Regions:
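Acidic (Asp/Glu)-rich catalytic clusters
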Residues: 5-7, 30-38, 51-69, 89-104, ...
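Long, compositionally biased intrinsically disordered regulatory segments in eukaryotic proteins
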Residues: 302-505
């Protein structure tokens, strides 16, 4: 098992791909790349089932190609992180994934998909405030201490047309990372979404200088590049992270500028993110990606282009035993209040003070939120074809009605990563609500209730089959010590989130 407490001790992996295990099919992707003389130096895979990751390591990815791991569902941005049992189970699962892939690190978005009981399909970025940075720093160190020697890379999230808080993005990540053994994942597209909110004028050179002057460069271990969309008809640049989309020229140019001009002494890997993209497009883009890396990055370039002395603010501590106490205690109640402000802004249209908000949160509400409820995790009429057919006989616009209902439901799932599960149970609750309020009545009511329960049960069964990854030690006498053992660290005052009602399913 790899032990890595310092990014400088991590292996230099080179130029690779970050992808999903299931689409595009990993074996087809690697075979096609090999036929085009484009074999990656390493393969990063997203969270899946342990058995599938093990199969990929042993039978799909050639033994000479290292694998790394892109985590999910470990929302260290959550004030309740230390106390929520789901995160202990997820940490145990992540360690199993790190074991079977042999990854020296786990990269994980600094974001959430559940905030104060509201469930989201898309990443919700943190509020850029010092109190939030302290919580993330504390929880990140806590998670890092449980990764059995592997390094945690905190990845900058995408900012969906807005950001909130008084810190700049770079200042925020400095406050999280400085004087810690944590690494950073720099996603160029995600960073562009933040840059366009902070800076009035864009050029690749200005973007690279912004990265150089504001981010903790010595913590950057991995760089990602993925698909990016630009919304039309907006008053300011509105960039949208979407790995299915092509990589636009502005993103290639920005990536090139960062590699060419920013001193990155801890950079060990650069990866093109290709999950959910068609293989012919991946072949073309990976060729371009490799050409840029070969031209603009040398793993030893920091010897020629070191950080200026006054820029060396991101020193990485070589051992967790040397960590100094936090300068200020993490204030959970303050962060919870900011979470409620974030929700009021995103979902209810509340307008915070201008100095607190960049961009336009209304764009999120109008262009993302409604679509993600109906589409993300599965198009609702595809998931519940018989149910939606029956409901549409009584409700003129099922989409609007369901989105409105979902918007009013406040919960946090017992496993706060599974949006499909939450959406499935919300659909059943929505139909029950329609029956209770007499929008559907008589024999039709009995029929639609039976139908939605049957379809929901099938979805949850299929989801457990495809995504279920129970701990193999859970059935041992005494259970699993990792899943059941509480996190230890500075005490937080958050209460565990309540379970999502199962409704008898």
């Amino acid at each position: 098992m790899t032990s890595s407490l310092n990014p400088d001790s991590l292996p230099c992996l080179g130029t690779g791909l970050s992808t999903d295990l299931y689409f595009p099919p990993l074996d087809d992707l690697l075979n096609t790349l090999a036929k085009n003389a484009l074999q990656p130096d390493f393969v990063e895979v997203f969270r899946g089932r342990t058995v599938d990751l093990k199969h990929a390591r042993e039978h799909i990815v050639p033994p000479a190609i290292p694998m790394t791991y892109h985590g999910d569902a470990l929302w260290y941005t959550d004030p309740a992180f230390e106390h929520h049992p789901a995160y202990r189970r997820e940490t145990c699962r992540a360690n199993r994934h790190l074991d079977v892939t042999g990854s020296p690190w786990m990269i994980h978005e600094c974001a959430r998909k559940a905030v104060s009981g509201r469930t989201f399909g898309y990443y919700v970025p943190p509020v850029l405030e010092p109190s939030v940075a302290r919580i993330i720093r504390q929880n990140g160190l806590l998670l890092s201490s449980r990764l059995e020697g592997r390094t945690l890379l905190i990845e900058i999230p995408p900012f969906p047309f807005f950001s909130m808080g008084q810190l700049t993005c770079g200042e925020f990540f400095r406050q999280i990372l400085e004087q810690t053994p944590l690494g950073m994942g720099l996603d160029i597209g995600h960073a562009l979404t933040a840059f366009c909110l902070e800076q009035p004028i864009f050029s690749p050179a200005r973007f690279a200088e912004w990265i150089r002057n504001t981010f903790p460069l010595e913590h950057i271990v991995e760089i990602h590049v993925g698909g990016l969309l630009s919304l039309q008809g907006t008053s300011h640049p509105a960039l949208w992270d979407d790995h299915r989309a092509p990589v636009p020229s502005v993103l290639w140019e920005s990536f090139d500028a960062v590699l060419a001009t920013c001193p990155l002494p801890s950079l060990k890997a650069v990866a093109l993110e290709v999950d959910n993209k068609e293989i012919p497009s991946i072949v073309s883009e990976f060729r371009t990606f490799r050409e840029i890396v070969r031209r603009s990055w040398s793993p030893h370039r920091e010897r020629r282009n070191p950080l200026p002395e006054d820029d060396k603010t991101g020193q990485v501590i070589s051992s967790r035993k040397n960590l100094s106490p936090e300068r200020q205690p993490a204030d959970v109640s303050a962060v919870e209040s900011l979470d409620f402000l974030l929700l009021e802004t995103l979902l209810d249209g509340k307008s915070p003070a201008p100095e607190w908000t960049r961009g336009d949160p209304a764009l999120y509400r109008e262009r993302i939120y409604t679509d993600e409820i109906w589409e993300f995790g599965g198009h609702l009429p595809d998931l519940f074809p018989r149910t939606i057919h029956l409901v549409s006989r009584f409700i003129a616009d099922p989409r609007t009605d369901f989105v409105s209902f979902f918007h009013r439901v406040a919960w946090t799932d017992r496993d706060p990563y599974d949006y499909l599960r939450a959406k499935t149970i919300a659909t059943r609750m929505w139909v029950e609500h329609l029956v209770q309020e007499k929008f559907i009545h008589g024999e039709a009511a009995k029929h639609v209730l039976q139908t939605v329960r049957e379809e929901a049960e099938q979805i949850l069964f299929d989801q457990d089959t495809v995504n279920g990854d129970p701990c193999p030690r859970a059935d041992n006498p005494g259970g699993c010590s990792s899943c059941d053992r509480p996190f230890t660290g500075t005490s937080l005052s958050a209460n565990p989130s309540s379970s999502l009602p199962d409704g008898g399913l």
